[in-house]
Amino acid sequence: MALPSPQVLMGLPALLMGPAQHTSWPCGSAVPTLKSMVTFEDVAVYFSQEEWELLDAAQRHLYHSVMLENLELVTSLGSWHGVEGEGAHPKQNVSVEVLQVRIPNADPSTKKANSCDMCGPFLKDILHLAEHQGTQSEEKPYTCGACGRDFWLNANLHQHQKEHSGGKPFRWYKDRDALMKSSKVHLSENPFTCREGGKVILGSCDLLQLQAVDSGQKPYSNLGQLPEVCTTQKLFECSNCGKAFLKSSTLPNHLRTHSEEIPFTCPTGGNFLEEKSILGNKKFHTGEIPHVCKECGKAFSHSSKLRKHQKFHTEVKYYECIACGKTFNHKLTFVHHQRIHSGERPYECDECGKAFSNRSHLIRHEKVHTGERPFECLKCGRAFSQSSNFLRHQKVHTQVRPYECSQCGKSFSRSSALIQHWRVHTGERPYECSECGRAFNNNSNLAQHQKVHTGERPFECSECGRDFSQSSHLLRHQKVHTGERPFECCDCGKAFSNSSTLIQHQKVHTGQRPYECSECRKSFSRSSSLIQHWRIHTGEKPYECSECGKAFAHSSTLIEHWRVHTKERPYECNECGKFFSQNSILIKHQKVHTGEKPYKCSECGKFFSRKSSLICHWRVHTGERPYECSECGRAFSSNSHLVRHQRVHTQERPYECIQCGKAFSERSTLVRHQKVHTRERTYECSQCGKLFSHLCNLAQHKKIHT
């Protein structure tokens, strides 16, 4: 079967201008206009199904390119028309839809598929059928954004839009190269599968699906409808936060996160934005997980989640990372992953210069500078920059914690949190620091730790200028200035600035201590306290001061120590104006003004302002001295006493007086010494009113009265 050669195809554009350039017209006869002289139908080349299948990829590409060029030339000559105007000739009613495979001598069953359901006449072209049905139903789904006029076909809308754009048919593209690049979407081995082309070339290139025609189906039933977007362009944008969506149906659900509209309420507890969410929530209460994966046995509450999970077993992984061997289904995910190894960070913040490996992380980071928090909790008024953090926070109020640890009984709102917690019991630490070799049980703790080495502290307090390595630390710190304490203990009424501190405090009332040291059998209410305690036995001190070389077991202790060098005291007491280097010392100090002593010894009835003081005191009754000096073997009831004692051996005097330069081994001794310079006398005798600079001097004086 003879096929047109590339030379024949490439010569087609010349046919358009041929009559105007080479034809001689009789004298006195009317010269035909360009409009009547040539139409796209005159220069189009059609193939049968058999002919099309014989073309290779290069020939198909050439055919597609030439047809596009012909269409562009016809359009520029004004020969491309829809049937909106009266009296339009059927041959002029041609748009990109004619780039279809024509079926010569179609059988009657095929022709029947092309008849109008309303009045029955057969129409030769599927394009004509769509327009004819439009006249019957009066449905015009395509609207011009400039003037509001409605059209039956997307192609006619684009033709009309040329009136606004000055007759430039390719106005959606900056140049011809961009058009041809976009048209490659349609150049696959099977060119009849794409139902969306309006975003790629001039009109809807609704190419025929030949198999459906042969089987008697109606492949054109949706031709007059606006197709779903099949590109990566996100058309529907939220006016509140700028987030964009592919589907219009997704936007209303997202908008509910900004408004107070919560249309679905669970009778057991909790409010939901979508109906499917409340159905899923009911399965939390009933414990129903009916969908089980046959491959690995993992169970799911929704069939959709099971199907999504099964793709990990069945899908072919096309993209493999040569660095670590990990495979991916999608190219974009693969590209993002490769940046972990290459260190590439192409997205840079204009405000602070920090770079990110993908755009979503940059958008999230930019909210740190703008202070934008569009997601507000209706229960406590707390606002969040991300919807994921907002949804996670809501579980604090609903108390939905379906994931329980079989080891200690602790429950969690997320399965990932349970997996992370389980590593406390197993001792697993899969995330290792490449700088110092220290290992962590989760990736976020590793990322947090690495900032110790880099010194990166990108989050700055606008109130006092203090900077932090994490946004969560900045938010916690900002509550020092605002005095905000939204989390209240239902047992004693005490309020806290964050939920984690409240949860930690509640264990005082319950006495719960699920974390036990395998070395000395001491138990703790928090896993972090157990990890901290474990370093007493191992002697591990991974945090070193770059100024003096001193090492510490905890990063928080290093930060506190660093203020000895910087003289920084960011925490101010609202009662007396005194400044402190640590928030914990400020809280401890504030109890001097309030007289609050919530911790009572069950043995002797003595009250204490701090839990740690009660624990230290309790050892007076038990005689326990768990902290032993490695130099001389002397034992102490508290770690602080051991640290203080060790300075006798090391001769360390970290607390220096800025007035006279004298150094001291203990901070309390420095504070006492500074009163010599300030002449401050804060201790008053209740008997005679005499003032003293030191408490010990007051105690000595009181003996005169007794």
From Swiss-Prot:
Pfam families per UniProt: KRAB, zf-C2H2
GO molecular function, one term: RNA polymerase II cis-regulatory region sequence-specific DNA binding
PROSITE patterns tied to this protein: KRAB, ZINC_FINGER_C2H2_1, ZINC_FINGER_C2H2_2
SMART domains: KRAB, ZnF_C2H2
Record-level GO BP terms: regulation of transcription by RNA polymerase II
CDD domains per the UniProt record, alphabetical: KRAB_A-box (cd07765)
Main location: nucleus
Residue intervals of every C2H2-type zinc finger in the record: 114-136, 142-164, 236-258, 291-313, 319-341, 347-369, 375-397, 403-425, 431-453, 459-481, 487-509, 515-537, 543-565, 571-593, 599-621, 627-649, 655-677, 683-705
Domain of life from the UniProt record: Eukaryota
InterPro entries xref list: KRAB, KRAB_dom_sf, Snail/Krueppel_Znf, Znf_C2H2_sf, Znf_C2H2_type
Keywords: DNA-binding, Metal-binding, Nucleus, Repeat, Transcription, Transcription regulation, Zinc, Zinc-finger
Domain (KRAB) ranges: 38-121
SUPFAM superfamilies: beta-beta-alpha zinc fingers, KRAB domain (Kruppel-associated box)
Protein's cellular compartments: Nucleus
Gene Ontology, cellular component aspect: nucleus
Purpose of the protein: May be involved in transcriptional regulation.
PANTHER family for the chain: PROTEIN ESCARGOT (PTHR24388:SF54), ZINC FINGER PROTEIN (PTHR24388)
Protein family membership: Belongs to the krueppel C2H2-type zinc-finger protein family.
Protein name per UniProt: Zinc finger protein 132
